[in-house]
Every structure is written in C-alpha cells, then in structure tokens.
From Swiss-Prot:
Its EC number is 7.1.1.-. It comes from the Bacteria. It is found in: Cellular thylakoid membrane. It catalyses: a plastoquinone + NADH + (n+1) H(+)(in) = a plastoquinol + NAD(+) + n H(+)(out); a plastoquinone + NADPH + (n+1) H(+)(in) = a plastoquinol + NADP(+) + n H(+)(out). GO terms for cellular component: plasma membrane-derived thylakoid membrane. The lineage of its organism: Bacteria, Bacillati, Cyanobacteriota, Cyanophyceae, Oscillatoriophycideae. Keywords: Membrane, NAD, NADP, Plastoquinone, Quinone, Thylakoid, Translocase, Transmembrane, Transmembrane helix, Transport. Coiled coil: none annotated. InterPro entries: NADH-Q_OxRdtase_suN/2, ND/Mrp_TM, Ndh2_N. This is NAD(P)H-quinone oxidoreductase subunit 2.
Amino acid sequence: MDFSSTVASQLYTGAILPESIVILTLIVVLVGDLIVGRARSGWIPYAAIAGLLGSVFALYLGWDNPHPVAFLGAFNSDNLSILFRGIIVLSTAFTIMMSVRYVERSGTALSEFICILLTATLGGMFLSGANELVMIFVSLEMLSISSYLLTGYMKRDPRSNEAALKYLLIGAASSAIFLYGVSLLYGLSGGKTILSEIALGFTDPQGGQSLALAIALVFAIAGIAFKISAVPFHQWTPDVYEGSPTPVVAFLSVGSKAAGFALAIRLLVTVFNPVSEEWHFIFTALAILSMVLGNVVALAQTSMKRMLAYSSIAQAGFVMIGLVAGTDAGYSSVIFYLLVYLFMNLGAFTCVILFSLRTGTDQIAEYAGLYQKDPLLTLGLSVCLLSLGGIPPLAGFFGKIYLFWAGWQAGLYGLVLLGLITSVISIYYYIRVIKMMVVKEPQEMSDSVRNYPAVTWTAVGMKPLQVGLVLSVIITSLAGILSNPLFVIADQSVTSTPMLQVANHPTEQVVAQVDSELVGVAIADH
C-alpha cells in the first residue's frame, strides 16, 4: 500500500464531502466578488444557495454510509450527524433568502455577509459530527466567532454593535468554562481525545475520578446550555436577538441551536454515560426553568424579536424533554422537532423581516390591522405562530406530541405536564399577535399599517424573501400531515447510531464503538 492510499484510508475524506462543497462555495463567493466587484454581485446569493443545496444532496448520498468515521476517529458522519448537518445547511439557505434585501438595504456588503454565514455553517456542521475534543472546541469556536461577527455586521447601527459586544463577552466566558470541562476530561482519561476512547476509561469510575467527572460534566453543560439558550444561561439571548440583524437572529435560533443539541447528545451519551443520572437531573432543571421563564416572560414583550427570543428559550426547554427521556423515541423526537422548528421559526422571522422592511419597526402593537393591507404576510405569520404554539394540524403540534409522548413513556410525568401547561401559556402570546393583525375596525389600525406601502415583490431581493416565506408556510402546513415519514427518518438515524445504545449496554457498546471508529487506522496498518 503506497503513501497516498495509506493517508486516504486513514482520513477517509469522503465523509466530509458536504463540508467540502460548502468550503468550495465560500471560495467561489469570495473570489467571485473580488473579480466582478460589488456592483455586479447579484449572482452571489443564488450561487451560495446552489452550493448549499449541493451539500444537502451530498448528505443524502452519505446516508447509511458503512464507513462513517473519518480523520482517525475525529469526525463521525453517521446518520445522526447527517440529519443535524442537514438542518444547519437548510437553515443557512433560508437565512440567505431572507438576507438579500435586508443587507442590501442596510448598505453593507452582501458577499462578505454570506462568507461569514457560510463559515458559521461549516462550524456547525463540523460540530455536529465532531468526535474528538480538539475538533469539538475548534468547531465550536468557528461557529461562535462567526456568530459574533454576524451579530455586529450592521456597523452603522449602535444596537448591532452593542449586541455583538454582549455576545462576545458572554460567549468568551462560556467558551472558557466549556474548555475547562474538556481539559478535565483530557486529564482524567490520561491524554485521550477521541470521545469513545475517553468513555472506555470511565466505564466504572471510582471515588475521586467519579467526582472529577461530575465536575467536568457541570462545566461542559454550562457551555452547551449557553449555545442552546437554556435558562439560566440565556441572559444574552433577548438583547442579542433584539439588536442583531434579523436574518442573523433567525440563523442563531435554529442553526446554532441545532449544533448545540448535536454536541449535547454526542458528548453526554458517549462520555458522561457513567454519570447519566446527574446529567439527566441537570437537564430536567434546565428544561423546567426554560419552559417556565421563556413562556411567562414572553407574555410581557412588546417587540416581536424579543418575544421570539423568549419563545426560542421556551422551545429549547421543550426539546430538552426528549433529551432527558434518553430513549430512542426521545432522541428521534428531538431531531423531528428541530427539523420542523427550522421551517416554522424561520418562516416567522421572514415575516418579521418583511414587515420591518416595509414599516421600519418590529413593535407588536404596530401589527394591528395588517390583514387589510397585506393578507399574504398575515397568513404566513399566523401559520408559523400557530405552529410554534402547537396548534393542530400544523407541524409544531406533532413535534410536541412526539416530545411529550417520549417523555411520558420514560416516566417524566411532571415534566410533560409542565410542558403542556406552558404550551397553553405560549398559545396566548402567539394568538395575541394574530388577533391584533386581523382587527377590522379602521380606527384600531396602527399608524405603521395605515401608512403601509403598496405590496410589491419586484424590488431587488424581494423574490427570495417571497420564496422563503411560501416554502416555510407550505412545509409547516404539510409537515404535520406528513409527520410519520419524517419521524421514521429521524428514528432510523437514531437506531442506526451505535453510540445511542451505550446507556443500555455500556461496556460492550463502548468497546464496539471504539473498534468501529478506529477502523481507518486498522485498514492503514494492513
């Protein structure tokens, strides 16, 4: 076996074909913009979306890959990571659709915005499949630093600068906390960095090792909770969401959150299985706090972006029910809910962007009477908000049903009942917006709606917004009806991922996982 084939067998670069396509797209956008100039850069968003769709197709081709482990065990392209990476890529594609008009109108460069967004996408994709401590941290920082830049991209807007500074300071602290937890794992394992190898040394922790592992768990969860906006690590979310460019907020609410949950599942199930009772308890507390605080505080909000920020916190609490369940049904429901949450949440943000572009405000009171001036926008926002509230037969209803049923089967009766109660609370503030939009009396119409410009889709960048809105509404409506096939796909990704069976057969499963993840090395040796 020659040198090139040895390297190829050890690295198995085919596992990162989707990421390679995104990297190529990033280079094309960057170099193309330098060559043709900003004045003729109208093709850039469409090239970026085409590249992202190509990445989705590459993910489809990688489904049921018999050799998912690459880079000497550092990256795992199993079906679980494929679905999470797909959610992140699709969220980026929709974000670009809603960004074209928004960024152009702000007077900033669209190509640079898309390049930073694609870099954040790469960080999220690598984080979803990262199986090694260094790669986890590098991917996390790649996603985080790009997110800081995106948050402060509107340099002329003081609110954007303030949001970026807050996000940077709190994010840097959370990264340091997470890194300390990771360093404890490195030391406890005797210098191991592959997750499954670390887990092999913790199959029966004793005394001080068990205590140190619990301490590492607390620090690791603190870093993860920041990424998914779980209470009490949520303080940055409302301010950052309100001050950041709305397309960036949309990406953070879905893409960044999906990457955080992917990391949580892989890290907790693989490494922290010996202290599973502890991390289940912690995430139960986080879920309770997130559902209660997120939904209750959202009732008092006057800004749509702040309301959706607290809604995002509450939605993370609902998703954590599936994580705490710790069963195949629980993990499947997490994936399914994030998949439908992608469309209903980004659809809602698309409507917020359209309204703000036409009126210059995002205050909830200014939506009064919108139905009389823009029925399509009213319909789209209503469908997405009702789905977020869990109203049947929309996608959000079935997503919550799967989460609550998985929690009920796992014996989490109190957590499920609290989820049901807080879901009812959430319906109130969603319905409040819808009721305001459909008022019929002219005197109840807000000043912004009374002076609402004529609805037109001919301006530059409006067509992608229209396409994104229509797609979001259609998928949100149909995903509820077609929930069973989608849930079957989510379930297949879970049942075909060996690491998720570690809890049932710790020693045997971990050993088997180590063997499978080092297959590249074994092939190279032969």
